[in-house]
Amino acid sequence: AAYGSDAVGGVVNFVLNKEFTGFKSDVVVGQAQKGDNQEYKGSVTYGTDYLKGRGHLIFNAEYAVSKGVNGDGRASRREETNQIPEPGNTTKTVRATDIRSPFTTGGHIINGAGGTAANNAQIRGIKFGPGGVQSPYDYGKLSTTVGTTNGFQSGGDGFRIGTSQEIVRPLTRKNLFLRSDFKLLDHLTVFAEGSYSETMADQQNSPTTHLLTIQRGNAFLAQVAPDLVARMTALGVTSFTMNRLTLERGLTESHVNDKNRRLLVGFNAKLGEWNWETSYQWGTNDISIPITNNLILARMAVAADAVVVGGQIVPRALAANPGAVAFNPFGAGSPSQAALDYVMGTTSFAETTTQDVADTKITGNLFTLPAGPLAVAVGAQWRSLKSTTRSDATSAAAGYRLANTQPFSGDYTIIEEFAEFQIPIIKDVFLAKQVTANLAARHANYSTSGDAESWKAGMVWQLQSDLRLRASRSRDIRAPNISELFTAGTQQNSNIDDTFPGGTGLTFQGVPRVTSGNPNLKPE
């Protein structure tokens, strides 16, 4: 009731020194004890009067850089510990060290297909090194990954995922602020504010893990592992599933650029014992997040199914996919640059959110009671929000391994009225230096969901200068924000543990999870 429905997680109160005069600068340099996460920050502030003191100007600029901390910079990430299912027991877990994912940079065989179960298992656990050289895959001390595409292991040949993800993201931040107020009349002051901020951050996402179905007649397999092809033929195995970390171009990375612009104009007027303030604010946020080295799933499926045509290795489905390039998955560094160009892409995502706010409020004292003046604040506010998201065609078709943000557009308006009363009840008596009651009410009308009311009733008992008791009861609402209402959907990959009795006990990696908005949400 006191702060409004947009006060979702509490209100950050700050005081702007509107009368600052002079010059101030700050420089901060630091780093973590480990010698990383270097931080550099500098700011300047200037304030001055003009036109014989009727006007005042304040300017501030800030620039900050944080180098961040990568996961491989800490032993806790290099030797990550976690709970994994006890091998052979789906109801118990053990705490294991050196946790790794079963995916490898050159790939290894999960299981065969087409033959008997026993024959399929005979080609399991073959790892491909540089040039396609075969060696046994080391499943580590403890493993839930044998013969499955999911799970974790302790030690062995798996990939330490924790080393590839930042503990602290690298960040660059720029801020500019300008404010001026001018006294037109003795009881009338106009003011204007403008601000600009830009934040740039790079984030390393999860490594590019993926599964491939390799046919026995794969052209690259025949080149690098003819003995394996012969063995598969003898066993009646027609294909196998292998996993792979495609890191030839590095990790999948998000490059965030977040810009905010804000303008505010308004006036303060003194009407006898009453204060009246009215303002209009416009703000916009532009955020773009290109994601580089993002795997295009359908293209990888086409590229990995390679055959020989006219003496050249090409995708089997080349006729249906002009421009496709065959991908050699056997061993780190084996794919050609042309193949990487074909299966990797850059996700394009941009969002613009605009907000307009008109606000007016009057504060003052209605009359004086024996314990002091009865203070009141009444006002109204109009807010309009609009958001538009744009993405590339592949994302819109959910074609990438990560993100796949869907384009959307949505808007809504809110009209609110509020009133608050501060009522002095007792003053300067035994055990009561002051007792004050507080009443507040707010009505909001949402263009998406209709009316909502909130209220608050409270009391403050000031026993003495150093002891205060406070009690309150309120009806509060939490309104959905514009993303929760209109977001079309964003896909992320998660790990899901099967902890149900009688379940597999495995951790399933890379499970797609879609988060989307709901226009039918109402304030709660």
What are the residue ranges of the model-derived segments?
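Surface-exposed beta-strand-turn/loop segments characteristic
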Residues: 1-259, 263, 270-271, 275-277, ...
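Hydrophobic, lipid-facing positions within transmembrane beta-strands of outer-membrane proteins
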Residues: 10, 21, 40-44, 174-178, ...
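Flexible glycine/proline-rich, aromatic-decorated loop/lid segments
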Residues: 15-20, 487-508
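Transmembrane beta-strands of outer-membrane beta-barrel proteins
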Residues: 23-25, 57-59, 190-192, 274-278, ...
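Residue-level signature of outer-membrane beta-barrel architecture
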Residues: 48-50, 180-182, 265, 269-271, ...
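Structural signature of Gram-negative outer-membrane beta-barrels, strongest in the C-terminal barrel
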Residues: 283-285, 290-305, 405-497, 514, ...
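Carboxylate/His-rich catalytic cores and anion/metal-binding grooves
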Residues: 364-403
